[in-house]
Amino acid sequence: MGSDVDWTWKFTPRAADQFDSLDTHIQDRICSKLDEIVESEWRAPGEFLDPLTGGPFSKLRVGQYRLACILDRSESVLEVHRIEHRSGAYTADDD
């Protein structure tokens, strides 16, 4: 059963920049998926995510894109930290 807590989602500045560079139809798809997660009556937000090894992030798949997310349970917020095409989502970067 879903969560009794009202959840919301937000982008970090980096994710917001990545989001802004995407085509509108991809942006719409990502927002729809994030809304579905925080509004679900049947599943808790964490049930939509797959944990990534070696760090605090979980993965959310939206079509060809991967979102690196953290669930802030104390604030009931799904924080999106990165949005990347799946071809480059799992490569190391400088930060």
Predicted region positions:
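Acidic/histidine-enriched, beta-strand-rich ligand/metal-binding domains
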Residues: 6, 18, 50-53
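Enriched for short, Lys/Arg-rich terminal
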Residues: 1-8, 25-28, 62-65, 70-95
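A short, surface-exposed loop/turn module that caps and links secondary-structure elements
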Residues: 35-60
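Active-site micro-motifs of SAM-dependent methyltransferase domains
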Residues: 17, 36, 85-88
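Surface-exposed, Lys/Arg-rich phosphate-binding patches that contact polyanionic backbones
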Residues: 14-25
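Residues that form or immediately flank small-molecule/cofactor binding pockets and catalytic motifs
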Residues: 14, 57, 85
